[in-house]
Amino acid sequence: MGLFQKCSRLSLRSSYMWSVCPQYSIAVTARETPDRALIVHWTQHRDVHNSRRLGANPANPSAAPPRLPFSRVTQEDLSFFRALLPGRTITDPDLLKSSNVDWLKTVQGSSDVLLRPKTTEGVSQILRYCNERNLAVCPQGGNTGLVGGSVPVFDEIILSTSLMNQVFAFDNISGILTCQAGCVLENLSHYLEERDFIMPLDLGAKGSCHIGGNVSTNAGGLRLLRYGSLRGTVLGLEVVLADGHVLNCLATLRKDNTGYDLKQLFIGSEGTLGVITAVSILCPRKPKAVNVAFLGCSSFQQLLETFQCCRGMLGEILSAFEFLDASCMNLLEKHLKLTNPITECPFYIVIETAGSNATHDEEKLHQFLEEVMTSSLVTDGTVATEATKIKALWSLRERVTEALTHEGYTYKYDISLPVEKIYDLVQDMRRHLGGMAKNVVGYGHVGDGNLHLNITSPSKDFDLLAAIEPYVYEWTSQWKGSISAEHGLGLKKRNYIYYSKPSEAVALMGSIKAMLDPKGILNPYKTLPDNIN
């Protein structure tokens, strides 16, 4: 099927709960904007006060804290590492540059040492030594993180998993893959596709990101709607703890109800509790029929109604439902020279179906498209069934992040909200910032309520940042959302955790960290707020 043609925002509640920090949560009633502005002012005041109490920078809670009293690397340390990892202990400043800077070029460390072990035993010996010497360590995979979690803040030793890239086993009956943590996601995808399977995870950064990093950040991605999160598909992990002990929970069983599910501690912990060295993951069969539809809607409300119709009519074959706004499309055309395949619309949708019967799937998709076109929910669209055309349509969603890098400095927010509220945040942020921002754009995963809010300016602008934060977190907390849907907290968001988690939960996280890493050498300054670290 080729190109085909056509044959309100909800208001803020008047009563809501502000939860900057649970100790200061209070129910507030607002009538109109002036009242709301007063409430926001009060909340910001208490947040700044609390940030001081936590030891954070009150002007910028996402800034780096003071360096903790870790030891510094000596020549004796380097001699040990060189003997342990001959030719794989990197100290050349030129070779260290890329590992010291995050993908967005917004966080830069000053590490003088990069270690590249090949085995779990190598990681174990490194951590045992570093723990005894009180040397801080920054685990690093593909370094594609967006919150400053994968690069050193100061002079932490970088422990790279890039050479831990072997597939140990694949069972083509159960679909269970066991591999080292440094395997690149795209390479695993190719490996599985040759065997008629696929990874349950797909990301725009798949050409660089490592499966260990995906697991340590609990990455979501484009297939979560169909296959669920990594907390469900990861069956087992091998993890090296801070003192060098190896925790082998590399199970290949779908059902194991013996005691606590310890692997869940390390999924999403961003390398602060242990270094993931191997993963076993359940992989689905490769679908025999894949279709991608790229559609246009004239309003976000129509987009939501299209999603509702889509879930009802496509059912079990629906594998992705993504969106991007017109501002995103403009950036794709401007910076990456990509072509919009349909007429201009305020909103665009990428729908993917995946099934085992091409005729059945195409019939269901045709019925769905006929319904949304007839009811005027969709104004224009195109459908692809060939691999090259499917890739071209997906690139319009996957390369938005890349296009944004050409706009100057980008403030990125990865928010989880009730689906009907996703785009309200984008619109409210535009009104809130006025002319301060160059661009405010929204895109993301409608299927799981995940908004990627991006705000650009010609260069780093502290006044703009002060206008964005904590407003974006207050807004999210008001609607009981999460300030991190899939990117993690890293360095940038660690002190904002109280917007999404009660103080009791954060305190318990600190207790777990203290138990597993009493010296705090693993990825310090990340994930947990400064009062816990």
Curated annotation (Swiss-Prot):
Keywords: FAD, Flavoprotein, Metal-binding, Mitochondrion, Oxidoreductase, Transit peptide, Zinc. It holds the Pfam family FAD_binding_4. Transmembrane segments: none annotated. Residues 107-286 form the FAD-binding PCMH-type domain. (R)-malate binds at R397, T401, K412, H487. One of its GO terms (cellular component) is mitochondrion. Its cofactor is FAD. GO terms for biological process: malate metabolic process. InterPro entries: FAD-bd_oxidored_4_C, FAD-bd_PCMH, FAD-bd_PCMH-like_sf, FAD-bd_PCMH_sub1, FAD-bd_PCMH_sub2, FAD-linked_Oxase-like_C, FAD-oxidored/transferase_4, Oxid_FAD_bind_N. The keyword Nucleotide-binding does not apply. It is found in: Mitochondrion. Gene3D superfamilies: 3.30.465.10, 3.30.70.2190, 3.30.70.2740, Uridine Diphospho-n-acetylenolpyruvylglucosamine Reductase, domain 2 (3.30.43.10), Vanillyl-alcohol Oxidase, Chain A, domain 4 (1.10.45.10). It comes from the Eukaryota. It catalyses: (R)-2-hydroxyglutarate + A = 2-oxoglutarate + AH2; (R)-malate + A = oxaloacetate + AH2. (R)-2-hydroxyglutarate binds at R397, T401, K412, N454, H487. Belongs to the FAD-binding oxidoreductase/transferase type 4 family. Catalyzes the oxidation of D-2-hydroxyglutarate (D-2-HG) to alpha-ketoglutarate. Also catalyzes the oxidation of other D-2-hydroxyacids, such as D-malate (D-MAL) and D-lactate (D-LAC). Exhibits high activities towards D-2-HG and D-MAL but a very weak activity towards D-LAC. This is D-2-hydroxyglutarate dehydrogenase, mitochondrial.
